[in-house]
Design a protein with these regions (language model features):
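Conserved C-terminal beta-signal and adjacent last beta-strands/turns
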Residues: 7, 247-248, 433-436, 562-564, ...
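Extracytoplasmic beta-strand/coil segments of soluble accessory domains associated
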Residues: 76-114, 135
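Short acidic/polar hinge/loop motifs at secondary-structure boundaries
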Residues: 114-141
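Outer-membrane beta-barrel translocator/receptor signature
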Residues: 118-120, 133-135, 146-158, 163-214, ...
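Periplasmic-side early beta-strands and strand-to-turn transitions of outer-membrane beta-barrels
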Residues: 166-167, 191-283
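Outer membrane beta-barrel strand-and-loop segments of large Gram-negative receptors
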Residues: 335, 339-346, 382-384, 469, ...
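Surface-exposed extracellular loop regions of Gram-negative outer-membrane beta-barrel proteins
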Residues: 373-374, 410-415, 424, 428-476, ...
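Gram-negative outer-membrane beta-barrel transporters
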Residues: 391-395, 495-497, 522-618, 689-692
Length: 693
């Protein structure tokens, strides 16, 4: 056996590939636990593991236990039900995620610290996230580029996965069924023995398309209507297969290798002659992500970690019917992306009561986009350092953090981002102040886009811009927090100022310009060119200003009764030229509330959870209407039966949208929505878990 371990270790080292692993002990969830852990271990805020109370930068933690109790099965459901500063707008091109008013391209999404790539119109495909393995979700508000680099302007969302080690072999299955064809099925198989671990999972999700009003206004009319089958919510079918291996030959060394494959295809109404809104094709998405890594712990305070990952993603059209000369089953690729990432990080306890982090990141991005005529790649090379020092000041403690990052981008060159934070702690009270800078490197589509198409007889032209500068932000925050075993209360005020925002600007077309455009796109006819009044080009133009405050409360009020309440006020604006306007899709007021009760009688435990989300209107610009606010409440009950030492059954029964709130307005070309619920729905689930010690 020792020979096999040595051979496996030498084989992994000989490949020359860095590998990733996490050394940790799983906390078993006992069905008799009656309180929430209000001081969990987190990693995202500081880059190393520490208790939430001890972090100089506030982090919001969404635990798997809370998600299970609320009956949450999707990633977007977890964020919107539990975090008021987050909103989603689903469509056929992916969910439009927003954090504190800022869109998906300003939010860095990580899985165990590694970037999740693959976007659809700047929206990361959230269906690639394997909820069957989520242990917790850590959300860091505000700029965090000093540690995490590009894209971390609005914040960082880090999904931490679970690799249980308590049982030799365990298997589980979770099924949830609800209205409008909603089905979630997840199966897991885990093996852990003598430092070796194997973790296998498969997840299938599906939902049907629907709309809440069968009518729409005819174009340019606010009185005449016609039937439509264009979905408000786009149905889909998706599968995720994941395999992860871990190996710890000693208590100091851990190795890890993992692979995730994802597949998704939309399920929309087909084209019909008697009604508008159907389509001839579905959108198909595929992703393949694998990573290897290693971590070596010299002692409790000093470690070295190396990670390497490759993430491939592609999407395009798959025709349901013969159309436009394409037979049934034809696949036309729209976009193919590949991201290669390598991280090297050392966590050092050189100075007493201090933690130093130094690291080097390298990332290569490649994009092939048929619609934009792009086949390009770029890279970023970065070095960063951060020192965190704790000082005792009488009975109080002062924690100071200073960090900086240097990035070199192939196109725009050098960039520097600093961070400074202070935390004053006295007993259970924490006072925090943070300044951090953020930046976002222009995407390959924004740099190299070269697009021409004709839509309903009108030509459309868009260009990228190699002279683009990175978008930059300055984030300031003040936080006061009281955290105890039974109560956690915090108030945060912040300001995030963004400059050099990359936007598409329309440029007027005159006769000389029209001729230049015809030379650039020879396929454009003179008749089409004569119809052009403008073309689009990516430019650094707008400024953004986001201010707000957040209130968070979590309490273990009585034995078995827990309450959480969160409120976010967001005042978000953008400036084009000399005019300030409201930031599109921002929400001024939002709140989430959850009350949870659980009790055990012998081998049976009941859990009752009531949760709600309330928000004011969603702002839109131009000719679009603002989307009205809403309030939705959900009720979920779970019933746990510990049938034996080797098995547990947990049926669940819930009602989504208890009060049947629906936006039934007649659709139009200027109408926007915030509430996408089809109304009250019954949700039924069953979780089974079996283990062999």
């Amino acid at each position: 056996m020792n020979y096999c371990k040595t051979f496996l270790l030498l084989l992994m080292v000989a490949t020359g590939l860095p590998m990733r692993a996490q050394i940790h002990k799983m906390e078993r969830r006992d069905s008799t636990i009656l309180t929430y852990n209000l001081n969990p271990v987190v990693v995202t805020g500081s880059g190393h593991h520490q208790r939430l109370k001890n972090t100089a930068t506030p982090v919001r933690v969404l635990s798997a236990q809370e998600m299970r109790e609320q009956g949450i099965t999707t990633f977007d459901g977890a964020l919107t039900r539990m975090m008021p500063q987050v909103s989603m707008a689903p469509n056929s091109m992916g969910s439009q995620l927003r954090l504190n008013g800022l869109g998906n391209k300003y939010i860095l999404i990580l899985i165990n610290g590694l970037k999740l790539s693959g976007d659809i119109s700047n929206n990361v495909d959230l269906n690639r996230i394997n909820m069957a393995r989520v242990k917790r979700i850590e959300v860091l508000d505000g700029a965090a580029s000093s540690l995490y680099g590009s894209d971390a302007i609005a914040g960082v969302i880090n999904i931490i996965t679970d690799q249980p080690t308590r049982s030799l072999c365990s298997a589980g299955s979770t099924t949830t069924i609800s209205g409008h064809g909603v089905l979630t099925e997840a199966a897991t198989l885990d093996i852990s023995k003598n430092g070796f671990g194997s973790y296998t999972s498969f997840t299938h999700d599906r939902a049907d398309s629907y709309r809440n009003n069968d009518l729409e206004y005819k174009k340019d009319s606010d009185t005449e209507t016609q039937p439509s089958i264009a979905p408000l919510f786009t149905g889909y079918r998706s599968n995720i297969f994941a395999q992860k291996f871990t190996y710890s030959p000693t208590q100091h060394l851990a190795l890890n290798a993992g692979l995730d494959y994802s597949y998704k295809i939309t399920d929309r109404p087909g084209t019909r002659a008697d009604v508008t809104g159907g389509t001839d094709y579905e959108m198909r998405y595929k992703g393949l992500r694998w990573n290897v890594g290693t971590i070596y712990k010299f002692d409790a305070r000093n470690s070295l970690q190396i990670d390497y990952s490759i993430d491939r993603f592609r999407y395009g059209k798959e025709y349901d019917v013969a159309s436009g000369g394409f037979p049934v089953g034809t696949y036309i690729q729209s976009k193919k992306q590949r991201t290669i990432e390598r991280q090297l990080k050392a966590i050092l306890g050189i100075i007493p009561q201090g933690t130093t982090i130094v690291g080097n990141d390298w990332q290569l991005d490649k994009l092939v986009a048929t619609s934009g005529n792009i086949n390009q790649e770029t890279y970023i090379l970065a070095y960063y350092a951060q020192h965190e020092q704790r000082l005792d000041v009488g009975s109080a403690t002062l924690l100071a953090t200073l960090g900086a990052r240097y990035d070199y981008h192939k196109t725009f060159g050098n960039h520097f981002t600093p961070k400074v934070s202070l935390m004053y702690s006295l007993g259970h009270l924490n006072l925090r102040a943070t300044y951090s800078a953020g930046f976002r490197a222009p995407g390959l589509d924004e740099l190299y886009y070269h697009y021409f198409s004709v839509n309903r007889g009108k030509p459309q032209i868009s260009f990228g811009n190699l002279s683009l500068k990175p978008e930059k932000s300055n984030y300031f925050a003040l936080n006061a927090e009281y955290r105890h075993d039974a109560l956690a209360v915090s108030v945060t005020g912040y300001m995030n100022r963004i400059s050099d925002m990359v936007v598409k600007q329309n440029i007027d077309v005159d006769n000389p310009t029209r001729q230049l455009l015809m030379n650039e796109f020879p396929e454009m006819t003179q008749e089409q060119a004569d119809k052009m009044v403008s073309y689009a080009r990516y430019q650094n133009s707008d400024k953004g200003d986001v201010k707000g405050f957040q209130f968070n409360l979590s309490a273990n009020i009585l034995r078995g009764f827990n309450l959480s309440a969160n409120f976010a006020y967001t005042y978000a604006r953008t400036k084009t030229g000399e005019e300030w306007t409201v930031l599109e899709r921002s929400i001024r007021h939002a709140a989430t509330i959850a009350a949870n009760y659980h009790h055990s009688w012998g081998r049976y435990t009941i859990n009752i959870n009531l949760n709600g989300r309330l928000q004011s209107k969603t702002y839109y610009t131009g000719s679009y209407e603002d989307a009205p606010g809403y309030g939705i409440w959900n009720l979920n009950t779970t019933h746990s039966f510990d049938v034996a030492k080797w098995g547990c059954l947990e049926p669940s029964l819930g009602i989504d949208n208890v009060f049947d709130r629906i936006d039934r307005r007649i659709d139009s070309s200027t109408r926007k929505y915030a509430l996408y619920s089809p109304g009250r729905m019954l949700a039924v689930g069953l979780k089974m878990k079996f283990s062999y010690l």
